[in-house]
Regions:
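Short, solvent-exposed charged binding patches
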Residues: 73-83
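A detector of short terminal or domain-flanking linear segments
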Residues: 1-20
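Amphipathic, hydrophobic secondary-structure cores in small proteins
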Residues: 18-72
């Protein structure tokens, strides 16, 4: 069973992101920022580079924040396989 989620950790943390020449703000929960950083380190790239990849690969009409969340879930699901 998963540990309980601390309410304070669910507060969105905004960060400015530079995607090419475009600057935007992404708001994620701290645990998702941590996961994104962990994934980037695992892949040997910066979090900024990972967000650029996610931005470039997302479908038209899908928000960047949603695309990041989906990427994180897919990354971890691929690693745990069938439950």
């Amino acid at each position: 069973m998963s540990p309980p989620i601390n309410r304070a950790r669910r507060i969105y943390k905004p960060r400015n992101v530079l995607l090419g020449a475009h600057k935007t703000t992404v708001r994620l929960e701290p645990v998702l920022w941590e996961a994104l950083g962990d994934i980037a380190r695992h892949r040997g790239i910066t979090r900024q580079d990972l967000m650029r990849e996610i931005d470039n690969d997302r479908e038209h009409g899908v928000g960047l924040t949603s695309a990041i969340r989906v990427y994180i879930v897919k990354f971890y699901r691929d690693r745990i396989g069938d439950l």
